[in-house]
Amino acid sequence: INAAHAFVDESGEIGGATATCEAVTRITGIPINYYVDFSFDAVAHVIDELGPIEFTIPDLYGDGVGMVYDDPVQSLHINLPPGDYQMNGQQAVWLMRYRHGNVNPSTGVFKGYVNGDSDRVEMQQKFLKAVVDQKVNASLILKIPSIFKDISSEIKTNFTVSEVIKYSKYLADFSSVNIHSYSLPGEYSSDSANGDVWIPNMDEIRTMVQDVFGYPADNITTDNPKNATRESGSSSSSGIS
């Protein structure tokens, strides 16, 4: 699905959110009608607008270091020692971008999440639920239009302002118990052409989609996950980002 976002077709157009929605529908059979594509700046902006988020950074490796990583090329410097935080927007972005620590110059290796991106996604989901539990309430509804206006230049979406206002009323009764997370069945694959990617198990996905979402398996329009970006397309060379 990440690969679909970075997919470049024959005309040179980048797939983006539209291609991602198409890929999800082809793989799961579930229609995706709306999307919001956030930049890192938008994420930081929203968290700062909502106010600090209480969140605990675990001692991932038992060494008291926590999440520390430096990438001068991207001007990325993550510094989140273990402990309790009143997390601001910049720290929230660090949390979501963190994958592993710096390379140990003596050994040439680095410490990272035990289960790789699966653990990273789980950490992101925990933070999302913390945001929902602490900040999503009836009073937020009044702030939604102004927040949407403020970040409009930092996001890509097919929501109109009127639709945002229309659907925001449902936030009044929303909590993290309404959020259910599922992972597409499959396995990791790594090669020089595609990098590290997750190959979906289409048979198991059909079963999951029927059991969890109630959509019939015959809605799934691809048996080849590598072609999920387009019916006649090929697999993207992009790795997991």
Question: Where on the chain are the PLM-derived regions?
Answer:
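Non-catalytic, solvent-exposed segments at the cell envelope interface
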Residues: I1-S241
